[in-house]
Amino acid sequence: CSHIAAGEHPISLDAQTRDSLQSQADRLACRGLRVLAVAVRRHCDGWQSLDNGQLESALEFVGLLALMDPPRAEVPAAIAACREAGIKVTMVTGDSGLTAEAIARQIGLLDPRESPPGNPVADPVRVIHGDDLARLSDVQLRQLLRFRSRLVFARMTPEQKLRLVQSYRSLGEVVGVTGDGVNDAPALRAADVGIAMGCSGTDVAREAADIVLLDDNFATIVDAVRHGRAVVANIGRFLTYVIASNVAEMAPFVAMVALQIPAALTVLQILAVDLGTDLLPALGLGAEPPEPGLMRQPPRRRGAPLLNRSVLLRAYLVLGLSEAVVSMGAYLLLLDRGGRQASTLTFALIVAGQMGALLACRSASLPFWQRLRVPNRLFWLGLLSEPLIAALLVLIPPLAAVFSMEPLPRPWLGWLPLAPLAVLLADTLHKGSLRWWRQRQTASGMVSPPSSRLSRANR
């Protein structure tokens, strides 16, 4: 612009006035407003034949237009939840640096205490403009992304958004990208998870994305992460419970070979446990509500197996071994008094031990009593079904004949509470020792707190 529009006689735009207008625009941008400068050109006959440079010359400045597009009220809490969950949020926008920084402070991505409010200078450490990014080599960009958090990239082109996604992925990070415009499509396609806006998003963005948000709400992504983590945790509970009985089921055959004694269980009795008494309880564990503190845990490593070492050790050496010791101990002590009844007691003790394992498996870290009041109808129905199914197999003569079982003498029933008590005691000691070890490792600096282990999500 060379002049300021003022009726029929435009005023010349000098350097001092230009600086004053720029300061006003910066102050508006510092409030998180998107600022547009409006100008006109007079006497533009034959404009169709002019190029862009000619059209954008000799303009008269009309005024500044500020647009407000405030973030949703839920976004600051969602950003804080991401930080607790170890998810690194990076803002990538086409807005100016001052506007982007102001919005980043409003949503809690940048700390408002790091810069005085209304300061018309974008933080060069946290806010990177497109021109600055273009001057960075790939190595420098990866170093920036690796060692800097809570970054804001302003005035980004589609190519630069794509470059950021590729750089994050080259660091081994799992990258999620949100976008709504055509210029976001390359980054959405290149990300591990592309998330398009369902209400305001373009057809191109929705086609390029993997997920479409129907409510255009960033907080919905955090809820999805929480439910996803809950599903993974429930799979771990399910697997731990299901394989816990394997040790107690294998122990009779090991003892049969080693001690030359009759097997404590028949094949049908093992199937009765695996396909009968364990089925509904396992489904109940799959429906467990999310555990408190789930979003304060670090993200899972990419490619980490669901059936990992901690699950196997806990299932076999803690829960399963406890069941095996009690069930085989009772069988060896009572074998001489009645073979089929001793076998029935072994079966009943494994079922009782699985009831204790069911209570223990509701959490991988909390003592079982801290989850007793958590509502889950399917879980409690499964817990009640175990002794009921076992009693039907033992007390109904046709079923007892098929499964080679007999009713137990009343004095032998005193063995049954020992199995769940042993399992719960062993699991409580195991969880306590793990908590003590982790606290010791964290205090000594050998293990970083979960909040410092970050996975990246690009926005």
Predicted ranges, named:
Residues 335-337, 367-369, 398-406:
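Membrane-interface helix termini and inter-helical loops of multi-pass transporters
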Residues 1-167, 171, 185, 199-200, ...:
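Cytosolic catalytic headpieces and adjacent flexible linkers of membrane translocases
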Residues 326-329, 385-401:
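Hydrophobic alpha-helical transmembrane segments in multi-pass integral membrane proteins
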Residues 429-442:
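Membrane-interface capping segments at transmembrane-helix boundaries
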Residues 354-358, 390, 423-432:
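Alpha-helical transmembrane segments
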Residues 28, 38, 59, 82, ...:
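Residue-level signature of catalytic and energy-coupling elements of molecular machines
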Residues 115, 120-176, 191, 196-368:
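Membrane-embedded transport module
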Residues 370-379:
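Cytoplasmic-side transmembrane-helix entry/capping segments in multi-pass membrane proteins
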